[in-house]
Regions:
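Soluble non-cytosolic domains of exported or imported proteins
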Residues: 3-10, 23-34, 89-97, 124-128
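Extracytoplasmic
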Residues: 58, 71, 110-112
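A mature extracytoplasmic/lumenal domain signature
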Residues: 50, 67, 80, 121-123
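Proline/glycine-enriched tight loop/beta-turn segments at coil->beta junctions
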Residues: 66-73
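Short beta-strand element of the alpha/beta-hydrolase
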Residues: 73-79
Length: 191
């Protein structure tokens, strides 16, 4: 099972890892957006959320997974743009590959809560895609149970002191880059 998952994650990375900055690598940006649209569209109700920046239209890709629950929504997102000159292998192809496999898993196995997966655009320019989408949620008064942002999931360095923190935090967290952190307004937890 894990070999198959590993193979699928690798296949996604082969398609996503490329320069895909929306301003300097528009062909790569378009290619990855269409790949995500195709992959996400297999698993539930797919739609686009359009927003504008500097007079141009950009697109967040949204998948609502099948679920009849009236419970508050769980939102899971990852961004698909990159900084200029970067293929974005870890920032954020790894998050997108996991997002696509979550689509597969929850498309085949209904969750107890409704789940919405979103591939955000223009995150590298000030979180513009997620801000535009959060404004839409606020306008529609959408209840959320939680939001998970899948960001840079593929890096691991077990060498001591490979992870740095501000001085006041260094005693609370590991000094190796081999963990996943979850944060909210209320707490930070390490896995």
């Amino acid at each position: 099972m894990f070999d198959l998952l590993s193979d699928r994650l690798s296949q996604h990375l082969e398609q996503i890892v490329r320069e895909r900055n929306p301003f300097f690598s528009s062909q790569g940006h378009f290619y990855v957006r269409e790949y995500l649209r195709q992959e996400l569209g297999q698993w539930g109700k797919f739609e686009s959320h359009f927003f504008t920046f500097q007079g141009k239209v950009y697109e967040n890709l949204i998948l609502d997974l099948p679920n009849n629950s009236q419970k508050p929504l769980i939102l899971i997102g990852a961004h698909y743009d990159t900084v200029p000159g970067s293929q974005g292998a870890d920032d954020n192809a790894t998050g997108l590959a996991v997002l696509l496999e979550l689509a597969r898993f929850f498309g085949e196995n209904q969750a107890n809560y409704p789940i919405r997966l979103i591939a955000f655009d223009l995150e590298e320019y000030g979180l513009l895609g997620s801000i535009a989408y959060s404004e839409k949620l606020k306008q529609t008064k959408q209840d959320l149970r939680l939001m998970l942002s899948l960001e840079m999931l593929g890096y691991c360095d077990k060498n001591p002191h490979s992870q740095k923190y501000p001085a006041f935090l260094e005693h609370f967290y590991p000094n190796t880059e081999d963990f996943i952190a979850g944060s909210s307004r209320f707490c930070v937890s390490m896995v």
